[in-house]
């Protein structure tokens, strides 16, 4: 029989891998955003997004942009595809984090 520690460790590994996938897709989106949507790139502080002095309110602006699916009106298919990927990976990572935390308290 599989122990609770093994299940929790496996959940933590899967969650970690998916969070890395999410951050990589987000970095790729910001790189593409520089050419595809320069105004949004400036609004979300594209150069300083992943720095320690990054402006949180500008980062929240990107979150709301993706959450409300404003990218559907954009003309660039690559940009909209990246936004969809980031949105999906964010939802997946958040759900996995919730399940992992729940499992940590139960097990």
UniProtKB/Swiss-Prot annotation:
Keywords: Cell inner membrane, Cell membrane, Membrane, Transmembrane, Transmembrane helix. GO terms for cellular component: plasma membrane. It is a multi-pass membrane protein. The chain crosses the membrane at residues 6-26, 86-106. It holds the Pfam family UspB. It comes from the Bacteria. It is found in: Cell inner membrane. InterPro entries: Universal_stress_protein_B. Belongs to the universal stress protein B family. This is Universal stress protein B homolog. It comes from Vibrio campbellii (strain ATCC BAA-1116).
